[in-house]
């Protein structure tokens, strides 16, 4: 899980979601692409 000021999709399988007011990226194809804004 990477924590970044700005999160963006890395590949076409990444999905931008919002959990408890936090923007996150989850990726089913490559778990290394997981990101959280903060």
UniProtKB/Swiss-Prot annotation:
Top-level taxon of the source organism: Eukaryota
Any one GO molecular function term: structural constituent of ribosome
Coiled coil segments of this chain: none
Keyword Repeat: no
Keywords attached to this entry: Chloroplast, Plastid, Ribonucleoprotein, Ribosomal protein
Subcellular location: Plastid, Chloroplast
UniProt keyword Nucleotidyltransferase present: no
Name of one Pfam family that matches: Ribosomal_L36
GO CC list: chloroplast; ribonucleoprotein complex; ribosome
Gene Ontology biological process terms, A to Z: translation
Similarity comment: family membership: Belongs to the bacterial ribosomal protein bL36 family.
Name of this chain's protein: Large ribosomal subunit protein bL36c
Species, as recorded: Mesostigma viride
Biological classification of the source: Eukaryota, Viridiplantae, Streptophyta, Mesostigmatophyceae, Mesostigmatales
């Amino acid at each position: 899980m990477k924590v970044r000021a700005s999160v963006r999709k890395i590949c076409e399988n990444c999905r931008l979601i919002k959990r408890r007011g936090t923007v996150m990226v989850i990726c089913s194809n490559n778990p290394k692409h997981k990101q959280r804004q903060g």
